[in-house]
Amino acid sequence: LLIGLIEPDQGEVRFQGELITPENVMLVRRKIGYVIQDGGLFPHLSARDNVGLLAKYLGWSKTRLHERIDELAGLTRLPAEALERYPAQLSGGQRQRLGIMRALMLNPEVILLDEPMGALDPLVRFDLQEDLRKIFQSLNKTVAMVTHDMGEAGFFGDRVILLGSGRIVQEGTLDDLIR
């Protein structure tokens, strides 16, 4: 809803107090980075091209594009050689790191994560969770995550919101909700 891929059945969607409309949705998208469960990568593009696609569309120079992608690869611990591969040639953890890089490419104000660990095996999940927590703390960004895993919610969030039928049922710290 926030990035305009789905229209609300009723009501309205606002970001930073501003109503999201078809006319301004692209401006809102530039302020939000998002990662979906399977990464949402384009299979016919290399990892590097997947990350830089929007920035290239916005007119970034080749030098700026490569510098930012290399910076994000270091931040997410994605091996340099992985940038030249296609998504099908990458592990699940590498694809998620790539999705995170793409979300961070334009230095968004807000980062949305939709089940970012859902398809990963436990060892990859643990490594990626540790890395993500460090990354998000260092960037000092607002991060919202959708997850069915309460432990994951508590690991990442200082505030957890439980939803039921599209409404807030409870909110607080994980410790508060467990009590």
Regions found by a protein language model. Give the residues of each.
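Conserved ABC ATPase signature
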Residues: Y86-L90, Q94
